[in-house]
UniProtKB/Swiss-Prot annotation:
Pathway(s) it belongs to: Cofactor biosynthesis; thiamine diphosphate biosynthesis
Entry binding sites for ATP: L185, M186, K267, G289, Q298
InterPro entries in UniProt: Rhodanese-like_dom (IPR001763), Rhodanese-like_dom_sf (IPR036873), Rossmann-like_a/b/a_fold (IPR014729), ThiI_AANH (IPR020536), ThiI_fer (IPR054173), ThiI_N (IPR049961), THII_Thiazole_biosynth_dom (IPR026340), THUMP_dom (IPR004114)
Protein name, UniProt field: tRNA sulfurtransferase
Reactions catalysed, as given in the entry: [ThiI sulfur-carrier protein]-S-sulfanyl-L-cysteine + a uridine in tRNA + 2 reduced [2Fe-2S]-[ferredoxin] + ATP + H(+) = [ThiI sulfur-carrier protein]-L-cysteine + a 4-thiouridine in tRNA + 2 oxidized [2Fe-2S]-[ferredoxin] + AMP + diphosphate; [ThiS sulfur-carrier protein]-C-terminal Gly-Gly-AMP + S-sulfanyl-L-cysteinyl-[cysteine desulfurase] + AH2 = [ThiS sulfur-carrier protein]-C-terminal-Gly-aminoethanethioate + L-cysteinyl-[cysteine desulfurase] + A + AMP + 2 H(+)
GO molecular function: ATP binding; CCA tRNA nucleotidyltransferase activity; tRNA binding; tRNA-uracil-4 sulfurtransferase activity
Chief location bin: cytoplasm
Active-site residues from the entry: C457
Domain THUMP: 63-167
Species of origin: Pseudomonas fluorescens (strain Pf0-1)
Pfam families (alphabetical): ThiI (PF02568), ThiI_fer (PF22025), THUMP (PF02926)
GO cellular component, one term: cytosol
Amino acid sequence: MKLIVKVFPEITIKSRPVRTKFIRQLAKNIRTVLRDLDPAVVVNGVWDNLELETRVTDPKALKEMGERLTCMPGIAHFLQIDEYPLGDFDDITEKCKQHYGDALAGKIFSVRCKRAGKHAFSSMDVEKYVGSKLRRECGAAGIDLKQPEIEVRIEVRDKRLFVIHSQHNGIGGYPLGALEQTLVLMSGGFDSTVAAYQILRRGLMTHFCFFNLGGRAHELGVMEVAHFIWKKYGSSQRVLFVSVPFEEVLGEILGKVDDSHMGVVLKRMMLRAASSIAERLHIDALVTGEAISQVSSQTLPNLSVIDCVTDKLVLRPLIVAHKQDIIDTADQIGTGDFARHMPEYCGVISVNPKTAAKRGRVEHEEQEFDMAVLERALANARLVPIDRVIDELGQDLQIEEVSEALAGQIVIDIRHPDAAEDDPLELAGIEVQTMPFYAVNARFKELDPTRQYLLYCDKGVMSRLHAHHLLSEGHANVRVYRPS
C-alpha cells in the first residue's frame, strides 16, 4: 500500500529551514508510531508532502495504520493511491478504468487531475480526454463537475501517475517534537482532557500533571484517560505523568483559609506546584481547562489573581468555549465516556465563593498556610513515563487470576469499546459481558452480587487494577481472567 501524506498547510508557508525541520520531524513521528505494525515502513519526504510505503497486507493492520495517521498532529490529510509510470492519455485512461470502470456504469461522474512538473499538457487537458473516454467505454450516465456521484481523482507528478482511491482527513497542527513542551493540569473531566487534546493537536508536546486530593479511584481514572490521550494523539513522543499528593495541602486550606477564598487559594497552590514541576522539566508553559465564568474560580478577576503566583505562561485553550461544545468535542475525541465515569473527590466546597477575589485579601488568607506542606507534596510527587504508568500501577497487585472460566461465572470484557468490537471475546458456554474499563467503578455495583465475575483485558494489567480497586471496596466476587 502507498500513501501520500499532505502536511498541515501552515507548514508550507514557513521558511525553507523551518519547513524542512517540520517535515523531517513528521516523517520521524510516522515511523515511530507505525513501527510496531511495520518495522520496515518507508517514509520519504518531499517539499509539500510525504510518501509512505508498506508491504503489510493484513487488512486489520492497514486499518490501524490509517487510524493512527488520522490522529497524528502535522497531517492535513492522506491519500491512498496506486502509482504507475506516466504514459500517454490513453494509458492514463486505462489505469483509471482498471480502478473505477465497474463503479461508473450508470453513474454521474467527474475527473479531477492535479499536476506538478513540466508537461506539454494541462490538468484540464487530462480531465477532458479521460472523462470523455471513460464515459463512452464504461457506460456512465454523464459528467457533472459540480455534483458528481463518483469523482475520479488522479495526480501527475513529473513522470509518475497516481490514481487516488480514497482520502482521509487528519487533525492538522504541527508535528510533535518540532515545537516546545507544555504541562497540562489534569482532573480527568471534560475540560482538562479537551484542553490537552487541543494543545496536542496544535503540535505542542504535553506532559500530564494530576493533583490527588485523596481519591485512589480518581487517580486511576486520570491515569487511564491521560494514557488514552497520549496513545491516540501523542505516542510519537515520550512524556511524563506526574501525580502530586495534595491531601495534606487540601487539609491545610480547609483549616486555615476563609471559606469564600478556598477555591482560589487551592488553584494558586496547584499553579505553584505545577510551576515548580515545570521548572524541573524545563517547561515554559502550563495548560488548564478553565473557561470564563464556568465556575466561581474562573471569573476574569479570579483567574488574574490565580495567575499571579507563577511566571510561567498559562495557556487556556478553552477560555471562551461553551460547555456543550466542550462535551461534544470530548465525545468526538474519545474522552467523553471517561469524563462521565470519572470518580470525583470534592473536598473544597465554598458556601459563598468570591467571584472577584482581591489579590491583597487572598495573600492575607495565605499567610497562615504552612508552605512546608506544599514542599512536602512536591517532594513526594511521582514522575512516571506515560507509556509505563498503567503497567507500573498493576505490577505489585496480588490478585487471584484464573486461566479458565467455569460454568456460572461471568466474564466481563473491560477493553476499550473499539478493541472489543474489532476482536470480540467469545467463550463457549460462558456468558461474556462488555463494560469499558472507565465505567467499571461506577457500574459494577449494579451487577448481581451473588454471581462470580472475571475481569478480562488484553494484557491483564487493567483488569488487575480494577479488580484490586473493587476488592478494596468490599466486592469479594471478582477475579481476573487470563486465558493461557
